[in-house]
Amino acid sequence: MGSDLREVPLGRTGLRVSQMIFGGAPIGGLYELVGEQTAAEALEAAWAAGIRAFDTAPHYGVGLSERRIGAFLAGRPRAEFVLSTKVGRRLVAAPGDVQGADGFYGTPQLARVRDYSRDGVLAALEDSLRRLRTDRIDIALIHDPDDHAEQALEGAYAALDQLRTEKVIRAVGVGMNQAGLLQWFVERADLDCVLVAGRYSLLDASAAAGLLPACQQRGVAVLAAGIFNSGILADPRPGATYDYAPAPDGLLERAQRIRAVCARHGVPIGAAALHFVLRHPAVTAVVAGARNAAEVTEDVRWLTAAVPEGLFPELAEEGLIPDASVR
């Protein structure tokens, strides 16, 4: 592999993933148009850095992210990478202008329809395979079943569980930003992994209360996404966003205090954000989205940076992170 990135086992699946997984939402045009060349350069930088796991979804640019990742990986040996996508949204022809829908730009003329039924999931996976130019998906995640938990459990999960039994897919999981509902799924389904977005970070460690212990108890791997809380933990400047909205003054002040402590230790706040998440024994890998090669390079540099042992105890002493997170 091309850097100091480690490969780690994904729970009980037999799969191994790079400790940093490429998150495919930004190259799907999230919040701004991303050109083909820019997206390809981001993927090339990830591969060159040693990233060998890629996470995408039909939702990301209504298929644009899947198509771009599929085109990039088509020339690579299939055994050399792990591919994750999601189910729960079917893509259908859209009658009107779709630019900016759900925050994505430069997208195909398609719309999303929620569908967590068995038949809907099977059809969605077939569509994803075509867009990804592959004959198999390694990890299938039920995507954002916030208001559809029971249907997702009875329909989507049952379908994915059968595909796993038939060895069509290697791992089954759920991906969303509600830690409590993820725990609900962990306690009711035989999951291999969960993808938790934004709920285990320097600013929001709420997943540590219930979800992460539940995953440890059941041998469920945790993939942590949204670890910069949409930007504030990469650069806590005035106007920074927290969970895709302008950061409240109190959170911005806290992030700036975290940055000041990090500076005393010679550590960029982005590096601290990554290392904090990976310190938890339940967390297998981080999912980091990037829209260009420079963002990939920066993320990898932060992940491979040395972080002094005294940083996190000092953050806890200052009341900026929970005491339990440094034990």
Locate each region found by the language model.
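Active-site groove signature of glycoside hydrolases
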Residues: L129-H148
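Short, well-ordered coil/turn segments that N-cap beta-strands
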Residues: L15-M20, G50-R52, P77-F81, T134-D138, ...
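N-terminal binding-site loop/beta-alpha segment at the start of enzyme catalytic domains
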Residues: M1-A93
